[in-house]
Amino acid sequence: MINLRKTHPLMKIINHSFIDLPAPSNISAWWNFGSLLGICLVIQILTGLFLAMHYTSDTLTAFSSVAHICRDVNYGWLIRNLHANGASMFFMCLFLHVGRGIYYGSYLYKETWNIGVMLLLTVTATAFVGYVLPWGQMSFWGATVTTNLFSAIPYIGQTLVEWAWGGFSVDKATLTRFFALHFLLPFVIAGLTLVHLTFLHETGSNNPLGIPSDCDKIPFHPYYSIKDILGLMFLLLVLLSLALFSPDLLGDPDNFSPANPLNTPPHIKPEWYFLFAYAILRSIPNKLGGVLALLASILILLVIPFLHTANQRSMMFRPISQTLFWILTANLITLTWIGGQPVEQPFIIIGQPASILYFPLIHHPMPSAGLFENYMPKPKW
């Protein structure tokens, strides 16, 4: 009897993507985050769908509808906590996934990498419009400050801001369109994910050594499907611990107050996963310069494939590049910390050098280190 999963038109696609997919035999747990991101996306879409059934995108009732979900809807508190903390887990997996791509040279699959950067931008936009929906103080002022950045664009800036707002300030029209975008964009992300996977399966996965592995591949199932389930257990453990024991740990206390245009919070800050870019924005005194640096902080990822100069793909046996990578990681953690602090000394004087260091770390030392490592003495076995 012919195996149905290998002949059926639909099951054949699933089989080639998740069951009989040839995978390198030596990929480590760092390759787990792709599947975890897919699971995070499914969790966010499902919990978001149930939240959308009870949420009202009106400035007068949005805040109270979120309170109603938490108090009156069966397990509404759990769905909301899973959705809010699920976003944090999503970004944690996303940053680790990108970091693994840089460390092991996966960016040399240019199409897959570029689609990945598009995915990162789309997820960032989705998270931003979603943060506005509870219509608390930080939601309102975060939306006002962030959308106002478009006014730095010469000539068309102010028109663009008013077009985004749907009026002359952040109001009902803004909330309605942000809700529509927040509902729609996850499905765009799902579509881009399929494109990302299509390009990945054209080349096959990279591996820690960064060498071709066509001669030594194993089927994805059961080897890596079981391995991914272990990662999923860890993800669910952290997510449920957050959602059940400390649901507001990563949130902002100001968001427990309804939005008030007449009262500005003492310190406006976005969610933790935007803080590194927010710190770079704040470190530059010029508004247009800050906006350009904010965009460049993510778009610089598109340049990385063209800066690869080493003979070896992976950083596994490149000690100088490894050192620079971990300096960059420490720099990003510093920027995340600074972004959450008020604009005062000593945070200003720490944030500015960290912001200045971020771009040259990627642009100059990494290609130079690659060239230098090509001529390092090789061990004689």
Swiss-Prot record:
Topology class, membrane: Multi-pass membrane protein
Pfam families membership: Cytochrom_B_C (PF00032), Cytochrome_B (PF00033)
Segments crossing the lipid bilayer: 33-53, 77-98, 113-133, 178-198, 226-246, 288-308, 320-340, 347-367
Cofactor requirement: heme b
GO cellular component: mitochondrial inner membrane; respiratory chain complex III
Subcellular location(s) of the protein: Mitochondrion inner membrane
Family membership: Belongs to the cytochrome b family.
Subunit structure: The cytochrome bc1 complex contains 11 subunits: 3 respiratory subunits (MT-CYB, CYC1 and UQCRFS1), 2 core proteins (UQCRC1 and UQCRC2) and 6 low-molecular weight proteins (UQCRH/QCR6, UQCRB/QCR7, UQCRQ/QCR8, UQCR10/QCR9, UQCR11/QCR10 and a cleavage product of UQCRFS1). This cytochrome bc1 complex then forms a dimer.
Function, in words: Component of the ubiquinol-cytochrome c reductase complex (complex III or cytochrome b-c1 complex) that is part of the mitochondrial respiratory chain. The b-c1 complex mediates electron transfer from ubiquinol to cytochrome c. Contributes to the generation of a proton gradient across the mitochondrial membrane that is then used for ATP synthesis.
PANTHER family: CYTOCHROME B (PTHR19271:SF16)
Protein name: Cytochrome b
Species for this entry: Sminthopsis youngsoni (Lesser hairy-footed dunnart)
Lineage summary: Eukaryota, Metazoa, Chordata, Craniata, Vertebrata
Name of the coding gene: MT-CYB
